[in-house]
Amino acid sequence: MKKDDIQKFEEYCSSVYEAFNSPLNINWEMNEKSLIGFFSIGSDYYKISCLRYDFNIWTYKFFFLDKNKDEFSQTSKGDTNNKMKVLSTIRSGMEYLINLKNPNGLIFMASDDSEARKKIYFSFAEELEKKFKYKLLSNRKENYQIYILYKNIDLDLVLDEIDKIKNEI
């Protein structure tokens, strides 16, 4: 490799690292049972939906505004140049939820063909497990991978609650 190529690669890696560690500002709306966040980058709009269930178990979902349908969708799209900032913001939102609501359980999932996204979400789950002293359980079926973080609660209670709300996850 030429010296210029190495320098370009290092600059690229540096910009990716910076974007991944620079979350966007999230505008939050909250009440006792929900925490809803909105953020945008360029002309793309995103929504984070966190809902509280029994035993202080929370779900965390991420949506992209599909401008063609004028509705939020869980299908991830948007400007690929901004993926790292969006992922950084998703991670930041998870930490905000944990710091604010101290959930006994946090449930989120990846539900598409992207293997990379599943790996990134798993790394988020591992970070949160260590940082906030959760236990982590993850399971995959077809294109769906669920991530369950829990503490201060019996796993059976978490699984029973998931069984009740599985259509909403």
Task: Report the location of each language-model feature.
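Non-catalytic substrate-recognition and accessory regions of acyl/acetyltransferase enzymes
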Residues: 1-169
